[in-house]
Amino acid sequence: MEEIQRYLQPDRSQQHNFLYPLIFQEYIYALAHDHGLNRNRLILLENPGYNNKFSFLIVKRLITRMYQQNHFLISTNDSNKNAFLGCNKSLYSQMISEGFAFIVEIPFSLRLISSLSSFEGKKIFKSHNLRSIHSTFPFLEDNFSHLNYVLDILIPYPVHLEILVQTLRYWVKDASSLHLLRFFLHEYWNLNSLITSKKPGYSFSKKNQRFFFFLYNSYVYECESTFVFLRNQSSHLRSTSFGALLERIYFYGKIERLVEVFAKDFQITLWLFKDPFMHYVRYQGKSILASKGTFLLMNKWKFYLVNFWQCHFSLCFHTGRIHINQLSNHSRNFMGYLSSVRLNPSMVRSQMLENSFLINNAIKKFDTLVPLIPLIGSLAKANFCTVLGHPISKPVWSDLSDSDIIDRFGRICRNLFHYYSGSSKKKTLYRIKYILRLSCARTLARKHKSTVRTFFKRSGSELLEEFLTSEEQVLSLTFPRASSSLWGVYRSRIWYLDIFCINDLANYQ
């Protein structure tokens, strides 16, 4: 019981983060604008929804209006114009959200910088990555083929935006900033405009994605922390194999009920979860929980998660959002891969004196394949090829210089190879490279008003070899994390995928 209390004890550091004055500083909006511009260079294609109307004149006008407190009284009858935002509500609201998202990330960035500065002294650092849409428990690199069942979970969303604000108040103790956040959410957005998807899953609206990903992930971060607690307390190999799923979140009053339940009969409560082969992955609005256990165990997990999340996290959840699938009979599109477990037959001949025996063995093998058809569909949607995979030119890039055209195609090709480097079969990737190479050649030929054959004869095929063979240092999508606890320090094999923007080439569903 003392171990549980130590785990749930909040960290008293980083309690005073006075961020509200920063919302009136011009450089904050400039830094937020430049930060988004630099990060957009890492995605596969240019972001068509990026707002390039930033100027210091607009920032000065916005800050002046925010200083005038009377203008915070906004008439809700006029949805397009009001005294505070003036005539361009969409532009101002986007600037405020970008600036606020940059500000609320400052405490976590400072914690990361402080930890990195002391890393040379062999201090294990911890940091938050609350804009990522991924979080992983040891999964793909582990011996996944020995697992039996998978829970496919559609992560629910909070029933009210106020819950997002309450989640942040455990980390940011600046009441003024939280009041501004609450005012901003309730005046300019509602839950329907925040979540814009007609499918069973959901996605965020294209505007202000950085802001809402931060809020939503801080909320999901809290829900996922229950896996940390249960996994650490129940695993037979808890001290060496798995470590913690996430850094713990201190949900105070909500967790007190959980402590009371465990205090009554701790061992009886946790017997359902004693499974050393439990894996968790979150990808956008989905997550999976894989286990070596039986169907009965997974069914108990299912109903436990539904009841726990509904009671303690105010989630709009029902059992229809969780499906139990047998791993050997189902393949799934997850994290951009087509993953499946197949039986790999092998035959062993045994010779014993004059008798020989043939022994058939079926070995499970975990395959991660590149989904060719959806990926070609994404390329076709971006006008690199037809729906049948025939390369075509990219007319909108014809006005660029030759080097810029080659650089754009090369960056897309390298990023695709980098993202799908974990595939067990690379044949599909070489076909994608062929499509991009020929599309690049046809774009260059269109620019110079010639055929592809004539263009290659005049310029030489070496022109395109560079973007096919050159190695560029690409920012790694995964990086190791380290966690610490109040009763010791340990290194855990946890990876977070630093992906906060998904375009059509990766998000084909």
UniProtKB/Swiss-Prot annotation:
Family, according to the entry, reads as follows: Belongs to the intron maturase 2 family. MatK subfamily.
UniProt subcellular location: Plastid, Chloroplast
Whichever gene encodes this chain, its name is matK
Q: What is this protein called in UniProt?
A: Maturase K
A biological process (GO) of this protein is: tRNA processing
Q: What superkingdom heads the lineage?
A: Eukaryota
Task of the protein: Usually encoded in the trnK tRNA gene intron. Probably assists in splicing its own and other chloroplast group II introns.
InterPro entries per record? Domain_X, Maturase_MatK, Maturase_MatK_N
| One GO term describing the cellular component | chloroplast
The protein's predominant localisation is plastid
Q: Which UniProt keywords apply?
A: Chloroplast, mRNA processing, Plastid, RNA-binding, tRNA processing
GO molecular function per UniProt: RNA binding
